Amino acid sequence: GGGVFRLEGDRWVSCGKMGGERGAYAEYCHDTVHALEVFQGRLYGVALYTQGLFRYEGGCDWTDCGSHGSRLMTLGTFRGDLHVLENGSGVYRFSSGEDWTKWTRMAALPGVTQVYSMAVYEGSMVVGTWPEARVFRWAANGEWIDMGRLGEELEVMGMAVYNSTLYAGTLPLGQVYRYDGNGHWTCTGQLDTTPDVKFRRAWSTAVYDGKLYFGTLPAGRVMSLEAGRSATLDSALAPGWRHLAAVRSAGMLTVYVDGETVAESSEFAAADYDLRNSQPLRIGCGQHDYFTGRIADLQIYRGALRADEVRESAG
């Protein structure tokens, strides 16, 4: 275990093993990959049972970036910085440099012994914890705000923002909760009902092709949810200026990039979705965070453009 692989066509190619057999401070071999994250064009990873942050250098080579003194649970990016969550109460931020002297402790969360998961929601970093399955939100003044507990669960596992809403998986019942605001979480269902086990996990999560996905343990199944309708572009935009168009027609949502269709929702009956509301229209700021880039020549139409009209607009 502990290997990382990349997909080339229809075959998997080894990218080596994080940390080799044993790090200088590791009590066990690095035999399990716990999390991977891309930061500033480089791939970083952490192991499950040992300390240390590792950076991929190409081929089968990994650099051991060191340890701040405790095991890490996961890592993620927010506002241009890499963050790691520890087997403890801390959240750490890394901005530059080659060693752990550049890491800044951002939090010591009360009553928390593991900071397990991370997401970006409404412009803030949010983290999930053990042993009370609470979610905390980072505020601009540096404070951490308790967003409530997920039922009677013990740990918040995978978290994702899907169709403008924050979802989180749990342990020990393998449930998925939806955040409804003001500290209130609603259980959307139990994904793992394996009998005669102590812990069931809704562990990993992703948004793909307009749906929310969760992986479960010990059942080993992948479950999906479609709430409302959405169309998602599941790859990064190419560098430079891109022409984007989002169109809602009578029964379909369509996303275009440079005049070409790149995503479509499943079909729906328009009458089932009354979107009238009193909320302000926000451009360049969504349910994740602010857009990092530049926007020009914004146009809003009163009707749905046809595909040929989008192509003409894209030039």
Stretch-by-stretch model annotation:
Residues G1-T32, V38, R42, L48-M73, ...:
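Trp- and S/T/G-rich repeat-edge/linker motifs of beta-rich repeat architectures
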Residues A160, H184, A227-G315:
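Extracellular glycan-associated modules
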Residues A47, E86, T129, T170, ...:
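Glycine-rich, histidine-containing beta strand-loop boundary motifs that form or position
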Residues Y28, T77, E86, W130, ...:
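A generic fold-level signal
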Residues R6, E37, V255, G259:
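Short aromatic-centered micro-motifs
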